[in-house]
Structures are given as C-alpha cells and as structure tokens.
Amino acid sequence: MGYRFLSVLVLVVLFGSCKNNVAPDTSSDKTAIAAMLDSFNRAAANAEYDRYFNFYTVDAVFIGTDATENWDKKSYMAWAKPYFDKKTTWNFTSIDRHIFFDKTGTLAWFDELLSTQMKICRGSGVVVKVGNDWKVQQYVLSTTIPNSQIDTVVSIKAAIEDELIKKLTSK
C-alpha cells in the first residue's frame, strides 16, 4: 500500500508541476490593437479630445519629439487641449506596423512608421489589456532622419540641445 501511494504521489507532483509553455493565441488581440491604434490616430486627426485621451490608461506617459516632452497623461492633456479646441491637431496614418506580446498575452508593444505632416515619423509604445479593451500605457513619437542627413540636423539642433544637456546633467 505504501509503494502504491508513493507512486501516485510522485505522479501527481510531476504532472502538477508541468507548465503549459504554449504561448496564447494573440491573433485576435493583434487585430484589436491595430484597430485601436487606427482609431486612436483618427480621433486625434478629427480633434476628438475625449475619445483620443480615452485610449490612454489613467497613468499613461507620452514622450514627444522634443527632448523636453515627457508627460504624464494629465500634463499631456493640458498641453494638447488648445490644439483640439482649435481643431489644429495632427493627422498620423500608419504605413508599417509591428505588434509583439508578452507571454501572458495581456501586455503588448508596438512600433510603426507614420505618414504625418512632419513626413515619416515613428510611433512606438506599450499597450495593456484593461478589461476587454487595449489601452496605451506609454507612447513615444520620434521623427526619422535619413542617415545621410544626420550631420545637417545635428548642426541645426546643437545650440538648443547643448543647453538642455547642460541643464539636465547639472541636476
């Protein structure tokens, strides 16, 4: 009786400790995130303030193209409000997008090239599943610079950013 009990116990422990290493099927979530990001961009283009900011989590962060633009949601909303009120917002259209998931399938990150009034920009960020919806936790907007033009761009921004570097490194 003792041998049989021990054998069953060993089997229970062995099978109970096995993990399912199969990644969750994220294809429908990938479609949902892509649709959310498209709607997010349309809301900005249409100057729909509440709708646009509803795509962000409560504790979201927006990082803009200027080195000083690292805002929590409340600060970003305050900065953007005049543009939405005057209907002079931005119009971004994704032209190439990649979406990746963590092992749980409830956190994802993306990068995309955007057609904008600034020509090609890169949007990237982190999205999290909140209930049944995907929300933007962090968004980073970057301008792209052709490598052949980097020296020209650096010379244009050097004076401004040298001062900012001094300020930031003296903290």
Task: Identify what each model region corresponds to.
Residues 61-71, 82-89:
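A short gly/proline-enriched turn/hairpin at secondary-structure junctions
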Residues 46-59, 63:
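Short, well-ordered alpha-helical segments enriched in acidic and aromatic residues
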Residues 1-6:
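Bacterial N-terminal signal peptides that target proteins for export
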Residues 75-120:
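Surface-exposed, charged secondary-structure patches
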Residues 14-17:
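C-terminal motif of bacterial Sec signal peptides marking the signal peptidase cleavage site
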